Amino acid sequence: MVRRYAVGTAAGAALIVSLTACQGSGDDKQSAQVPAAQAIALASQKTATVDSYKVAVTAAGTGGEAAAKMHGTIQIRLKPQLQAVGTLDSATVKGQSLPGGERAILLGDDFYAKVPQQLSQFTGGKPWVKFSISQASKQAGVNLDSIIKRANPAEQTKIFTGSKDARRVGTQSIDGVQTTHYTGTVTPEQVGRLDAGAQQAFKQFYQRSGANKVTFDLWVGKDSLPRKLVTKVTADKGTGSSTMIFSDYNKSFSVSAPPAGEVTDGNQLKNALGSQMH
């Protein structure tokens, strides 16, 4: 159980982290006439003005350590401070099912994860554990703050603006919203519109994985906001895919830190879990 919670917490953190970072045409006739590359660029530009959104995400990977599948829902506020609240509804790692319903909160540098009752002995009975994003970055040797700031619909859509084969497929209703469907591929050499740091991270990922391109399907509403994004990658060691459904753009929601008396320090739980895993 201890190991399963540790893996589940990591999966929930990865899900939330991976998701938190020119106006479009107003009628069907104009939208149909906009070239695919221009429409994708408009979507990236329009989404950059968004303050908050909700996303339901399903991610899956095959092959070795990457064999996993998870589904969750996250509400994210990008401005003025990064805030998010999410639930990991289900997760499977290397064929092992993990507890569902795990809740997590992100407030600036602070990440809170709900502790299953079975593990309350390691937290003094407290139901929440708190981690620092900046401290975790130092321990992992990775700038998680930078990754979080880039992990938003605008940056994700911007990746596909360099595609040389993007094309319009047709129209489709996504959760009651009429959208135009675009599809295409992008390679590490075609991400020139990203900043230097994002380009380097993108290229390094594909060098390590052995992948040479990403296949994407993007559904964009009349307001030039993405409503659905599906990405697929085939690499040397397996495959990966993700499906994201976006909604509730610029809608307000409440999120606050758990009461201080119900929170334990993440290092305490980390040490306890570590001793149980050896």
Regions found by a protein language model. Name each.
Residues 4-14:
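Sec-dependent N-terminal signal peptides
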Residues 2-6, 23-278:
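Subset-of-secretome marker
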Residues 13-16, 105:
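Generic alpha-helical scaffold signal
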Residues 18-21:
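C-terminal motif of bacterial Sec signal peptides marking the signal peptidase cleavage site
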